[in-house]
């Protein structure tokens, strides 16, 4: 019912590993005619932009870019990072990535302007990270079938816990608050029609994905990490450094743990992976803090001084 004469679907496109492979599947396997959509909120790296350009060029696909007020978005992140540094709280790390949630708002605009209803996402179910909300004191819902939690009661609970944490550092009550809350609204409260996730129907296989992207499309990898996950995200290096320094693990640990549970890799393989993946991404972190106009040494000194949640 979704196939049309010209374009069939919208593909939200970050230039990352999963969205790129999704586009490959949509064109090569499903034989659909997509248009891609990218939301630039100020933390899309040059690496991601190059991969977006490379992939869309090779596959002959149009890329619609909706750019936020980049300077304002970065100012918002800076205000929230300053507030976080005054009272470091692992449960509040999500405030630093709140600006990208308007991705969900503008996909509706793209649907309206193109007349295309179907949007196919490359969200990987193995990416679920319960610990991020867990650091706020929220217990995981293992029956949740989505990467992002939805529903009024769940969101009200989440925001009540976050509000209490915000009181510990009043700097969070700044001009970015409306942007944060409205982004959360579009992500978690608005009705999602004709949204489908490719990897709900197609097996996600890391080796196949990496080989396809790199060998067939000359997809560019990062120079400061062995992983291909989130390498186009300007925030990932910093928040994973914080999690690893304070808690002793990162989202890479949870990702590999999910793979173990699925029987995809062994525990020994997972430990070998995270030994490399959890190493600090100096270049990514430096870019992030420089872009925000923050002093690298001062910020890292605060992070390193946070009391650890583990014993050596």
Model features per residue range: what roles?
Residues 1-8, 25, 29-312:
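Nucleotide-activated chemistry modules centered on ATP-dependent adenylation/adenylyltransferase
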Residues 9-18:
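Short, glycine-rich nucleotide/cofactor-binding loops
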Residues 21-22:
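Hydrophobic positions on the alpha1 helix immediately C-terminal to the Walker A/P-loop
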